Amino acid sequence: MKILVPTDGSKYAEEALYTAIELLKAKEGELFLLTVVPSLAGMDLEISAGRSADILAEFEAQGAKVINRACDIAHGEGVKVTCKGENTAPSIPDAIVDFAEKEKVDLIVIGTKGLGPSSRFRMGSVASKVVRHAPCSVYVVKKKE
């Protein structure tokens, strides 16, 4: 079984990671961890041309920290893991779905919300779009309170 866990470093993504690890311990398979650094073009930010490279580098550095931490957790739990960072994707949900299609994953395990602003009563926009467009089943994990 191939399981994909997209992670942004949020507590919800971490809960999804631990859920996927438990699933893989019960059924042998491979874990794919993915973090996606959004492109600045897709953001509603006013940035001077000179600052855009600095901001993008900052986002990429943060993405590297996120994926490295998640990979360390998975390695520590003894599961087979492939870690990938996608840089400057115009759409985070599209990057997740594209990765799932390319790697032919069997299941995506994703947190209900990420680091973005979100309402208590609606699923995060990334998770919602992944559920609608994924080529496989999607297990949406709520954070344990």
Which stretches of residues belong to each language-model region?
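Short, flexible loop segments at boundaries between secondary-structure elements
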Residues: 136-145
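Structural beta-alpha unit
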Residues: 72-108
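Small/aliphatic-rich secondary-structure junction motif
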Residues: 2-51, 73-77
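General small-molecule cofactor/ligand-binding pocket signal
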Residues: 32-34, 82-86, 139
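Solvent-exposed polar/charged
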Residues: 22-25, 101-102, 132
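Glycine-rich, Arg-bearing micro-motifs that act as flexible, cationic patches
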Residues: 107-129
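A short acidic, glycine-rich active-site loop
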Residues: 51-65
